[in-house]
């Protein structure tokens, strides 16, 4: 793999750094090509400039989490990724009865902008070291479980106390910068009125689909425009916004980006890397593949999709293959060099409450599961690619060699490494139990009904504790977020798919891993919920008169497979067929719960309606709750023990590296990374240039059309609208499409603005190529590359293809 320009300039040390480190890094950034002072970038300090670039950055998505966005106008216009906005587009489509996801959307007037559901923007206003408060409150505890809970509670209490003193509905969070050593408080301004402005059609915003995902060359229009509004219904006026550079950036140019990358584990011991490679990642991949298969089957059934056409039946090449033109009117072409005419005084409509979703007939499944399906497909390819790269670069062997060197220099490291190996051995031994429980509690896009029941039952148990000792998601300050998340999942239930997920959870779970006893949990009693009061005894809910249980029938039932008979009159064999699972789904009262009802039940479980208490899915959760609680406590203790050991190990390493700057692992907070627009060589005799064009997109579509005619169904994802193809062929082939650069990114950097040396917007980050998937564990500038949508593609699509002259003018306004 060829050396990168940034590797030559700085070795391999320049990674992704907390925004607060900008001043310390400024000398090196300037040497690379940065032309801005540090104060013009970092606006999070106590005396920071409100116009600093960091104040143009937002964390955007459901409840403020999902990806990165940035203000690109003084009127609250936000650019983010198509896939970050996808869930908002999907929800808006269901409410309006118009498929914005397939057809795209453009608001030519602000009155046409569409309200999103649950989407918020969070702006990082301040960050502050609160290590003393957290470590002092928790650091003396020796018991692993109590210690882990003490650190959790101290961080959450610090955030809660500080939030109470903030004005205007601000949100505070405390994150571990160096676990058990350094903690940082982040203060966010929350904007809860976010509206759709522009979304390209799916055939462009997701061009290439899963085939092109994490690959180069790439030609995807993965961007969208939103607008934030204030409480007064007027467009939000940010203290800073990015200027757009209409000429983009060229090969070799210095670039940097800001964003909210998720989590890295770059200081992980070899034992953790082995566990990821052999246990955790393979398990996730199996789970994701299974769920994707179930989703595909549900889609085929819902849409009556025919098998791919045989070659003999192929229709004319491009005409049949090109996606149908979006139903919106053909827009007027716009010359990007001409300033839009002055508009009349705009109106600022108040945010209207979301309208109820119209009944969907055909295609309803696709809109309901689009975001979940894309997320699972993305995570499956990312996880499998990450595992492949772990092996390809030999990271486990490399880390073992580093650990041997550390032990030679600091013998005290040996017992720490041995104890860490024991932690991961235990995590491996209990992995089957966790897998079963995750299925039964609906995580990772599993059953929404099981997920809702799990949260409600957990709330009933946790309600006996003081608020400051409950699970974080069940504390008062978080209940709005929890209720919104659950309500969204329940609203998206597509009954046939939900039944398949329920069946998979109930028949695919490893009961032996949950219960060491010869027979499985008493799920027959759980399902016979209409005739029992055991649950009220457990959670302190009021009892009601019940019929006696036929103990003889119960004992006979325990001998049947899965012990899931007696389910609302089912025949022996229980919930072992899709029809039986569908019966459970159709009868469940949880499906009808909305956000307000869920919020009330989570806050006061003892007032939960009897029909919810007695729901069959509540019974399932009750049956697996004891092992769930035991697993949660043991896993938390193991992770807490790991954090203590890793902190001590890093103390030894940093003591040996005195004077060398160290960057902490990513934790979802605002960060900066820098690099160059540059290609790379992935393997022998292959060199990748750093830019693609619209002409390359057309060529790829033409090639895919031939493959589609030959029966390749996946080629459907390479079908742009016919009018788009005509426009590109008419003179736009050389317009840049996507761009490659050597910044350090990972999940959470979706939507990060790529900025030139002067801090101007030149691209929007949306992906990495396959070798860069190992970034979670290691960044290497020789082969780690990120992919962005070139600003010239954005301007061409918004202006020329969709004729939104006012939006282009707004983006180019200084």
Question: What is the meaning of each model-derived region?
Answer:
Residues 1-814:
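Terminal presequence/propeptide segments associated with secretion/organelle targeting
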